[in-house]
């Protein structure tokens, strides 16, 4: 994670965003309720076990329509702050909640790349 160049929103500069047609963006799951950007948000699903109760983590991508830097955020909705699963896994590679988050974030990244909105991300690299 060290020495990764990031954009002004903290996203690895190797990752690029491409805005597709309005119809395609909506089909993929983006909204543009805020007229100046496309927004994608998906909740991370945890097992229905007591030890995971209370986790409310989301994966978010915000792409400004003016071409300025986009953001990719994993947020802890309970504490209204970033959930830095990558840093936590760097310190404890077996921390189960972060492994769950990582797997689903990577699935959403692959989905967005497969659909042509994002490019340049390789599995496991810093986002």
Feature names for model-found ranges:
Residues 1-28:
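Charge-rich, low-complexity N-terminal segments
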Residues 2, 7-12, 35-40, 53-59, ...:
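Generic structural motif recognizing short loop/turn segments at the entrances and edges of beta-strands
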Residues 3-6, 14, 31-33, 52-59, ...:
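Contiguous hydrophobic segments
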Residues 9-10, 65-127:
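Intrinsically disordered, low-complexity regulatory regions enriched in serine/threonine/proline
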Residues 18-20, 26-65, 85:
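Ser/Thr-rich, low-complexity intrinsically disordered terminal regions
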């Amino acid at each position: 994670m060290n020495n990764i160049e990031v954009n002004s929103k903290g996203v690895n500069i190797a990752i690029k965003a491409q805005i597709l047609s309005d119809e395609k963006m909506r089909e993929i799951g983006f909204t543009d309720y805020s007229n100046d950007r496309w927004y994608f948000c998906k909740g991370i699903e945890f097992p229905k076990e007591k030890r995971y109760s209370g986790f409310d983590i989301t994966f978010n991508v915000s792409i400004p329509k003016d071409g300025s830097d986009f953001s990719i955020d994993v947020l802890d909705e309970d504490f209204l702050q970033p959930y830095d699963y990558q840093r936590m896994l760097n310190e404890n590679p077996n921390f189960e909640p972060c492994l769950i988050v990582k797997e689903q974030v990577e699935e959403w990244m692959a989905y967005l790349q497969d659909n042509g909105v994002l490019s340049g991300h390789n599995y496991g690299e810093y986002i």
